[in-house]
Amino acid sequence: IYLAGASMAGFVDGETVSMRDLLYGAVVPSGAEATEALAQAVAGSEEAFVTMMNEKAAALGLTSTHFMNTSGLHDEDHYSTVREIALILQAALQNEVCAEVLSAENYRASRTEQHPDGLAMTNKFLYRVHHEYSLGGAEITAAKTGYTAEAMNCCASAGKTPDGRSVICVTANAWTGEFCIEDHIALDSKYCGSAESE
């Protein structure tokens, strides 16, 4: 995963890390080393965990989703659709721990010998949305971004409209991370209320 250029949370070889810290490391900064460590801890190998991922996708009724790895790196047989990613996010948010992690703007991992102050992480999408935009009464409460050269910048977000309705938005193929944010803000503005940059 290092050689493939995957994004990392910052954990290092030999570091003892809790499952909680790995979960945050996998989601908040999209740490591929965290997803691989979680897979090893839960299923014994990445391959076995990917099998579990595909079984879960089938249990959710997804017919256009297939996983080949835990990092999201490109593979011709690793694919989904924006609709099915929305269904995955909807299911994840029903899990209390997943909802907490997906909603975290910032997180600091426990102190370790390698990171005496704890590894600091930021969900840059949520940070930008929360601090640089006014959403006109609507709220983006959770988000997970992703990037590959093939899919470009993608994001799945969840939020609330001013009248309290739950909304999930999934976008793909944005040229930059900034465009990805602007896509979500534009959709929020159109369907959930006004949104203005501060």
State each model region's role.
Residues 1-2, 75:
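A short acidic, often aromatic-flanked loop/helix-cap motif at beta-alpha or helix-coil junctions
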Residues 2-36, 116-133, 140:
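Conserved catalytic neighborhood of penicillin-recognizing serine enzymes
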Residues 22, 26-43, 49-53, 85-88:
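Alpha-helical scaffold elements that line and support the substrate/ligand-binding pocket
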Residues 44-198:
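Penicillin-recognizing serine hydrolase domain
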